[in-house]
Amino acid sequence: MNRAFDMVVVGAGPAGLCAALRLNQLGHRVLLVERSRSWPRPQIGEALTPGVRNIIDLLDANDALETVPILAGKPTRLRWTSEAIETVAHDGAVVDRAAFDAALVRLAQARGVAVLRPASLVRVDGRPGSWRVQIATSEGLLQVDATAVLDAQGRQSRREPQRLRAPRLSTLWAEIPASARGPGADRATRVDALPDGWMWGAALPSGRYRIMFTFDPSMRGDAPAREPETLLRRACARSALFEEMAGLPWCNAPSMCASTPYIDALAWQEGRVKLGDAAFALDPISSSGVEKAMRFSLQAVIALNTWCRASNAMEQALARRFYESRLVESAARHFAWSAGYYRQAWCGESPFWRGRSTPTLTSGLAPDDTLAARVADLTLALQAEWAQIAVVRPPSGDSAPRLPMHDPIRLARDAEIVVVPCATGDRVIAHPALQHPNLDRPVAFWDGVALVPLLGALTRAALPLELIGSLGGSMEPASARRLLEWLWSKRIVEPAAFGANACPTS
């Protein structure tokens, strides 16, 4: 086996596999290390949101996943905003995660990724760009050289002091055999809010039905550890959607895992980065953990590819800035979304729900801890992101007024041009972007076209019809009109008078 690699990826879940496949596409020599002895390994987290399809397309992995069992098109029965049960369409899918992961491992091996399993990371020595990685295998210790190390070990990657954590959550789950529910049982996904937690259930491709109860273990003493089966059955019995399952047999005894959301303040270290749940873990209420893990892995790969191939320290710093900004943005948006969803629960006045109705993260670090500064910086960045999310609201009224095609408009005076790190192709570059109070983040590209060069025509008053013509060299007239309508709807352009002073764009 080769002893020199560009990248060592530790962990063969969706995040690690996505990174390994993408790094391989970019020409890196990749070693994938997986600790699990049983393979394919059983997993929870089978829900796939629609965005996963685009990621699979990018990885050119559709053929490899053709035979993976998947269940899609099932409705969701929901009891959340009120005690009434509603049925809604559901555009996600449930996949056999063991088969999903195994298919991607086979694809990675077929493309030249070296795979060690079962194997585990023992230690990393050396310096950024020149690591000596010690790995424990069934045949003894193995040492390899690597430019960079990517940690995709999920919650098993424990450096908890630097993690900012949301209020505690644990999840209990069990599976009901198909024979116990009968041939005519509905296969709808179910989501139910209870005063002390929430339940989720979904049919699996195997025919089994999985039920899960997510709750705060700190509110229950040691009961979850002592009596997991009793706790899960009682939750079912109290649920309007799961009551019929309270007495059904289970395939195995219930399992329990930690499901507290968090973000790691040391996710980026020079030449060593974290992916997926090792970097930040979502609240399971989103059912989007697989997509978020894979998408963030793609962003991390671009940052690390830039860092490894940078010609100077400024380019490496830009790569880090890109990674950390995407980490903060992804985590902050999810924490804010989760808090908003918790606020909607019909039982929202109970302590479980009140404690999660606003984004709250704590670290438990002492002020003089050496990690405190990193945690403080991360906290400030998250708070700034939350503040921006909070102030960005749709324009007042049911809908924005129509773009006045025959009246002059120009760029609003509170629009600014800023320079931000952007992914273009497989590298991070500094790129000009439009910033405005009505945007939740700077926008560098619109419909695949660099936006800032298009704004020059808007620095002085002009008619929209004329602007559509002047933008014709960069895009189709229909796209130009959509751009102007979008800018108008966001109040980024405003009514103007001919001869008015030009609006600065820098």
Over which residues does each language-model region extend?
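FAD/FMN-dependent oxidoreductases across multiple families
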Residues: G221-R309, M314-A339, A345-C347
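A conserved beta-strand/loop capping segment in the N-terminal third of enzymes
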Residues: R53, D57-A103
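Beta1/beta-strand and adjacent pyrophosphate-binding region of the FAD-binding site
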Residues: N2-A15
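Conserved N-terminal glycine-rich FAD pyrophosphate-binding loop of Rossmann-like flavoproteins
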Residues: R37-D57
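Acidic, low-complexity/disordered tracts enriched in E/D and polar residues
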Residues: A373-A457, R481, E485, E494-S506
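Glycine-rich FAD pyrophosphate-binding loop
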Residues: N24-I44
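Predominantly flavin-linked oxidoreductase catalytic cores and closely associated redox partners
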Residues: L107-A246
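C-terminal helical "tail/cap" subdomain of flavin- and related membrane-associated enzymes
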Residues: N305-A400
